[in-house]
């Protein structure tokens, strides 16, 4: 593609003159076919580029050609390529500032920031000598510089405002912050989107990604109702053809809804190959604590990698609650012997649980609002409320 570097630079120039942000983004993309053109692998392209382009676009293109050069080395110079991509991002910031009342270059910004994140991830994987997450955090700083320019654009009309680029960048930053486990940095970004008058004008794919990450953050903050709201939006609006994305959303939505008392349907879990949750739901419904523990133990790595291990562990309280409710139904009394709960635990396979541990489990269930009542230690009994002693768990 483009044959010579002159043809390539001529194409970049025409895209800029036509205010064609999409084409310009393609010329600067590391995923476009032009990256395979050996004629573009130039270590010092500045003089050549300056003949075609004016600042700061010339800096963006020069840095891009240097990225291609470093990636073509054997082995690839990921760190050098990242450094040049970071320089390209800085030049894009200056370009955004130069184009005061225009937003046609937003696709270019998206592409440069996306490739910066990809290169940062490559550095984290292939390079040594720095703290894990360091390069990604530096990349986030560069992307944040673009975000600030977009967020500060209050002079343009709705059609030309750079604020329409905010959500794309926020999603890029979310992906970094979740990867390096710095979720607290998401809060000001969420506030910025909430306060943006164009928050309903962002493209639907961006809104789906945004709701997915905000839902996950709400989940980690134990704000489960909000998590269900955001994740449900993401799942409902994600097209069916993106089955892998819908499955990813369900990995978080299903356990959160289970924690709120909603059990998933077998057909849904079969469709998205998530039968792990069906096994958990069946054990939970039956109050089979031992079986629940077995499933969690067998799937521990999967749950940890998905970031839902602790959330699934919280479901265990509902398993206890369901088991002890069965004792209440059988005994048909509001004064229940603690020994009956111990026997129930032994019956489902927890043979090493003591009476003292049973007291602790029941006390935690009372504290958590899953049982309405109190423990009479003098009589070794649980006295439950005559009205709704085992409150339903729901929204």
From Swiss-Prot:
Question: Pfam families given for it?
Answer: PCI (PF01399)
Instruction: Provide the GO MF annotations for this entry.
Output: double-stranded DNA binding; protein domain specific binding; RNA binding
Gene Ontology cellular-component terms for this entry are: cytoplasm; cytoskeleton; nuclear membrane; nucleus; transcription export complex 2
One Gene Ontology term from the biological process aspect of the record: protein transport
Q: What InterPro entries does the database record attribute to this sequence? A: Csn12-like, PCI_dom, TNF_CS, WH-like_DNA-bd_sf
Record localization? Nucleus; Cytoplasm; Nucleus membrane; Cytoplasm, Cytoskeleton
Keywords carried by this UniProt record? Cytoplasm, Cytoskeleton, Membrane, mRNA transport, Nucleus, Protein transport, Translation regulation, Transport, Ubl conjugation
Specify the PCI domain's residue ranges. Answer: 208-389
Query: What is the top-level taxon of the source organism?
Result: Eukaryota
Post-translationally, this protein is described as follows, namely: Mono- and poly-ubiquitinated.
The family line of this record is: Belongs to the CSN12 family.
Q: What is known of its domains?
A: PCI domain is required for interaction with polysomes but not the interaction with sbr.
How it assembles, according to the record, is: Component of the nuclear pore complex (NPC)-associated TREX-2/AMEX complex (anchoring and mRNA export complex), composed of e(y)2, xmas and PCID2. Interaction between the TREX-2/AMEX complex and the ORC complex is required for ORC localization to mRNPs, and consequently mRNA export. Within the TREX-2/AMEX-ORC complex, interacts with Orc3 and Orc4. Interacts with sbr/NXF1. Interacts with Moe. Interacts with nudC; required to maintain stability in the cytoplasm.
Q: Briefly, what is this protein's role?
A: Required for the export of nuclear mRNAs and involved in mRNA trafficking in the cytoplasm. Component of the nuclear pore complex (NPC)-associated TREX-2/AMEX complex (anchoring and mRNA export complex) which functions in docking export-competent ribonucleoprotein particles (mRNPs) to the nuclear entrance of the nuclear pore complex (nuclear basket), thereby enabling the export of mRNAs to the cytoplasm through the nuclear pores.
Instruction: Name the chain's protein.
Output: PCI domain-containing protein 2 homolog
Please report the organism this UniProt entry assigns to the protein: Drosophila melanogaster (Fruit fly)
